[in-house]
């Protein structure tokens, strides 16, 4: 498991750390996910959650822990969450500091099932987040039916935004919608100072990406904040 921080530039604090799957020798997510099948999907999803919580406790992770989950691996939210709740209790990690992100790694075929999971998790006290907003299923149709606590802007939507007026208009419109709905916005995949500056000027305060820190395997990476 690797960890990458999500930073709050208003006070240079850590909003959360995202747990990113890695192989036992540090192999990348693509290598690991290529070995996940329909038969081992559930056990893989459960193992990732437990591993993320165990390492978070060992590393004394500050702030929130963001965990990706696969909707197709969850058949009944109240049953599939038991191992997560038991581990959180065992390592003394408050559930209100756990943020569940809907991952884009698989095709969501049953939107009502996804909505049921998100509503159930929110009812249990977890933070809910939609990853890659603006891509695939993670768009306005989903937002119309469920308003998560957090959305993460799709990396493709913000890539080169400092020199792309169309992307600027789309992101500004998304930010306005989220303000009206009281949804927190995270810009992920930030790699350049230009992208960061453009988004900061639009009012974004939460960022994730190589500009700030690369993921660290079984560790919390040092953070580099751009000059104000």
Language model segments and positions:
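EAL-type cyclic di-GMP phosphodiesterase domain
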Residues: 24-46, 71-79, 90-124, 156-176, ...
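Glycine-rich phosphate/oxyanion-binding loops and their immediately adjacent helices
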Residues: 122-125, 140-142
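Bacterial c-di-GMP phosphodiesterase EAL domain
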Residues: 1-91
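Short, well-ordered coil/turn segments that N-cap beta-strands
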Residues: 60-65, 93-98, 124-127, 149, ...
